[in-house]
């Protein structure tokens, strides 16, 4: 479950087309996380002055969320590679290629501790109403898979089709030991005229850019998946 450093609101305000609604939603989600961690307040309704009623906190929500997450993903889902619908009969070469690809996928999931991450993501989704799955490809680190909790990303869809994502931005806070200050990494995808662009920047706590990791660059994607 998410224990990440808080992302400054200013970064969301700069990216959101409706920051007031987004920040109100975030405030509600923060309250949900507080209830999950600390329990919900409960006070006796008895107004008698003969005694001081006990103030109790119950963690029923946390117990239910933990049990439901384990129930859903104690056994991880099977990941299968299927051929294109247009292929009527697989050749031996096709079957070999599919087997190798499935082996590669299983290896990537294992290296990313997919089973553990999936249970944590389920808890984040139950609490924060949504999570994002992000796959990154890097020459140094290979293929990495991450689940991003609600308080670390935003997305916006097309006015004409809510199934089309036009913007997706996610953030990751970290501590810069050289600067002795918190930094925030931002990765932004935008869909413009059928082309997906990506940009990466690093910001200080006030939202100012301290480093451009990747200038806005077109990708080979025609949609934000």
Residue ranges of each PLM-predicted region?
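Active-site and NAD+-binding cores of ADP-ribose-processing enzymes
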Residues: 138-225
């Amino acid at each position: 479950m998410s224990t990440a450093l808080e992302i400054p609101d200013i970064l969301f305000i700069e990216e959101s087309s409706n920051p007031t609604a987004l920040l109100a939603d975030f405030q509600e989600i923060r309250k949900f996380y507080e209830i999950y961690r600390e329990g919900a307040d409960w006070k006796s309704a008895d107004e008698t002055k003969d005694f001081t009623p006990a103030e109790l906190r119950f963690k029923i929500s946390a117990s239910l969320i933990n049990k439901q997450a384990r129930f859903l993903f104690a056994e991880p889902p099977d990941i299968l590679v299927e051929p294109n619908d247009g292929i009527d009969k697989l050749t031996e070469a096709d079957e070999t290629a599919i087997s190798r690809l499935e082996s590669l996928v299983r290896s990537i999931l294992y290296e990313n501790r997919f089973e553990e991450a999936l249970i944590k993501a389920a808890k984040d989704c139950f609490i924060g109403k949504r999570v994002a799955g992000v796959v990154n490809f890097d020459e140094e680190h290979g293929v990495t898979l991450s689940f991003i909790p609600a308080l670390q990303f935003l997305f916006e869809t097309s006015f004409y089709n809510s199934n089309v994502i036009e913007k997706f931005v996610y953030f990751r806070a970290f501590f810069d030991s050289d600067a002795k200050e918190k930094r925030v990494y931002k990765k932004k995808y935008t869909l413009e005229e059928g082309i997906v662009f990506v940009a990466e920047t690093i910001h200080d706590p006030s939202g100012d850019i301290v480093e451009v990791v990747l200038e806005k660059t077109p990708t080979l994607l025609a949609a934000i998946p």
